[in-house]
Structure formats: C-alpha cells, structure tokens
Amino acid sequence: MPTLDRQDNVFVLDLGDGENRFHPDWIASVDAALDEVDKAGGPRALVTAATGKFYSNGLDLEWLSAHARQHEDYSASVQALFARVLSLPVITVTAVQGHAFGAGAMLSLAHDFRVMRADRGYWCLPEVDINRPFVPGMAALVQARLTPQAAHEAMLTGRRYGGTDAAAAGIVDRAVAEDAVRATAVEIARAQAGKAGGTLGTIKARMYSRVLAALRGATPQG
C-alpha cells in the first residue's frame, strides 16, 4: 500500500511495490496522503514514486469485474484522484521507475513534471487495444497535458513509449538512469517548494478549469 515520507520540504509518496492498481483501498490511501500534503502548510512539494517493476498498471480490472454494479462510482473515484493531483496547490513531480499503463500513465500526466527511467519500463495508454474508450475527463486530461501530436499517437495507437522516446515526445520531462529517477524528481520538487500555496492552486484551477470540470462532472463510462 502507499506510504508517505517527508524529506525536508519534499513529501515522497511511494505508491507501493506491486502493480499498484487502482483498488478502492489504494485510492483511499493515496487520497489520505494527499490530504496530509495539502494541509501541511509552508514551503513543500510532492514527489510520487513506486518501488519495483511497476509505477502503476492502471485500473483494478479484477476488482471491477467482481463489483460491476459499482462501476460508475469506481470510475468517478479514479477521475477525482486525477483532479486532486492536477489541482494540488504544491508543485508535483512523478518518478516513473517502471511500467505506467492506462490509468497509471494518466496519473503521471496529472503531475506538473515527470521523470522516467531511460532504459527500461513503458508508458502506455492501451485503451484502444482493450476496448475501453476514454471517458471525457480522461481524454481531456491527456489532451491538456500532451501536445496534439503526442496525444493523437498515444491515444489512437496505444504505443508503448520507453523513457527516451517518451522524453522526445514530451510525455516526460526527463529520462534518466534507474538510480537517478527518484533523486532527480526530488531535486526538481525541492527547487519549487517555495511556490506552494493559494496562488499556485488558483493558477492551476484556472489553467485546467475545463479538464477539472470534465474530471469532476463527466458521467463515468469506463
């Protein structure tokens, strides 16, 4: 399960050491950690990272299959998490050390900056290959955080991007060696910790007002 640590002005949220799928308990744990970051006050920034082969493998399809009647509530909770990260009044940096697929890839896009391992691991939106159309909020998030060309290719082809290719496409900001992923993310976050506060939160809310409205208000479909 996710754990939260603090290194001076930088909170580090480790999403876990498994596939880190979006199980309801996992979502609740991440949301509780974000509550702590939000309420902390003072200079601060957030890094999200993970341990092992996966950053996040996306939706918990096994749980969803067993709880089909909760489909809409589940989808709404996933979109609410994206909106929470996107609008958090601190600078957020994600350290993608392993595979980021589907909702895991979208979670990375909700952060302000992204660092990815250069030599192994893929960033991928496989929805087109698994017959799960993007709901409006998720589509809006991807299109707001990527260039039109990158969003078009990622969404329509399901391409698997390695770190170097992801950096070239603007999906991530930096691709670095395995042992530098988390440290680089912390370095970026620490340099921007002084920006935390209401002004930053207002800028984000206005910059992404349409995306946030779609994530919070769209009827979940998948």
Give a label for each model feature.
Residues 1-16, 154-194, 202-222:
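Amphipathic alpha-helical segments at domain termini/boundaries
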Residues 92, 114-115, 175:
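Short, well-ordered beta-strand core segments
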Residues 48, 107-108, 166, 185:
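Hydrophobic/aromatic residues within transmembrane alpha-helices
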Residues 101-154:
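CoA-thioester-processing core
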Residues 49-81:
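Glycine- (often His-adjacent) and acidic-residue-rich active-site loop
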Residues 33-36, 77-89:
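Catalytic-core regions built around general acid/base machinery
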Residues 1-49:
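Conserved CoA-thioester-binding segment of acyl-CoA-metabolizing enzymes
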Residues 95-101, 154-159:
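Glycine-rich beta-to-alpha transition loops that act as phosphate-gripper elements at the mouths
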